[in-house]
């Protein structure tokens, strides 16, 4: 079994990623305010416990996630040995005179608004501004973010810009951050990606990625990072009022999550531990991305990720009809 701080080499790029990685939307105050002292402690906890792979984006906190991550990472004297930094392009942050509070990110400055921009200038501007917010001189991995409505621009405009920046050494790897398997496959068929961050499509509730995307990624030697392993909450605590894909979960989804949880409980296995470890069942998956709001949550996720599970647990869930059979 993998441990949270175990490193694995990327298939195409000379980078080592820890099996458990840290997403930074929660530390930027996703849905609920987070004090900067909490975010500092969280990032230091990740580093002090051997995690090296950090994912961020201009969207998260409208620049706040990158700024908070940069407070800690920017002070490290040997960054290449300490962390792998992944951010995203496809949106720029514009200042507006009149603005309403941001419901998703209450800590964000409401005058700073994200706008999709897949133009060549927009991609360059996004990266330049990310470098400044992060306080670093290079990005390890740049992902095209939420390109489902910008597929042509991602393929024909953004990717060539990123490929050129990769040749210049400003970035080391190019990928996409996406929620849709079909979009990921279409982009992969047209450009030479190094990595895909896929949210919510290879979890205990949704194994749709294994039908086509994960086998294709193996064939193309493209690394896969799986995010959204709790499907935004229902797999962490499947009770009425839980969320699935950031919306109220249906009774059917809650019942399915409860059934999986009850089956695992009879075996003495926490649902959260199984949810965190499940994606690594597929050989295409390199890392599991978890978002944490504070160091307590992160330490709990590390413990769940490191918990030893029975070798046949996934087969047992298959036999019980609770997950799909593995498809390679």
Kindly give the residue locations of the regions a language model identified.
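Distinct, well-ordered alpha-helical segments
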Residues: 66-75, 97-99, 127, 131, ...
């Amino acid at each position: 079994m993998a441990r949270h701080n175990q490193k694995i080499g990327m298939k195409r790029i000379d980078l080592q990623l820890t099996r458990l990685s840290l997403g930074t939307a929660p530390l930027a105050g996703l849905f609920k305010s987070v004090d900067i002292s909490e975010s500092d402690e969280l990032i230091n906890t990740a580093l002090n416990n051997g995690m090296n792979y950090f994912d961020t984006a201009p969207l998260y906190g409208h620049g706040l996630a990158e700024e908070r991550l940069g407070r800690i990472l920017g002070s490290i004297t040997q960054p290449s040995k300490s962390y792998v930094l992944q951010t995203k392009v496809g949106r720029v942050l514009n200042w507006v005179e009149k603005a309403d509070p941001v419901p998703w990110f209450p800590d964000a400055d409401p005058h700073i608004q994200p706008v999709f921009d897949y133009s060549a200038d927009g991609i360059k501007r996004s990266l330049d501004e990310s470098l400044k917010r992060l306080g670093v001189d290079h990005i390890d991995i740049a992902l095209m973010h939420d390109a489902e409505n910008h597929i042509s621009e991602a393929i024909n405009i953004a990717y060539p810009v990123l490929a050129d920046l990769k040749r210049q050494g400003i970035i080391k790897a190019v990928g996409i951050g996406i929620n849709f398997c079909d979009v990921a496959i279409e982009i992969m068929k047209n450009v030479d990606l190094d990595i895909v961050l896929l949210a919510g499509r290879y979890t205990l509730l949704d194994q749709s990625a294994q039908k086509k995307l994960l086998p294709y990624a193996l064939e193309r030697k493209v690394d896969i990072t799986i995010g959204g392993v709790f499907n935004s909450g229902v797999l962490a605590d499947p009770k009425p009022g839980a969320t699935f894909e950031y919306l109220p979960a249906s009774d059917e989804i809650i019942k399915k999550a409860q059934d999986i949880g009850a089956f695992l409980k009879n075996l003495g296995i926490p649902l959260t531990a199984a949810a965190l470890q499940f994606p690594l069942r597929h050989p295409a998956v390199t890392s599991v991305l978890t978002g944490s709001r504070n160091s307590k949550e992160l330490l709990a996720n590390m413990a769940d990720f490191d918990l030893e599970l029975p070798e046949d647990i996934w087969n047992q869930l298959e036999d019980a009809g609770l997950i799909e059979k593995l498809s390679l």
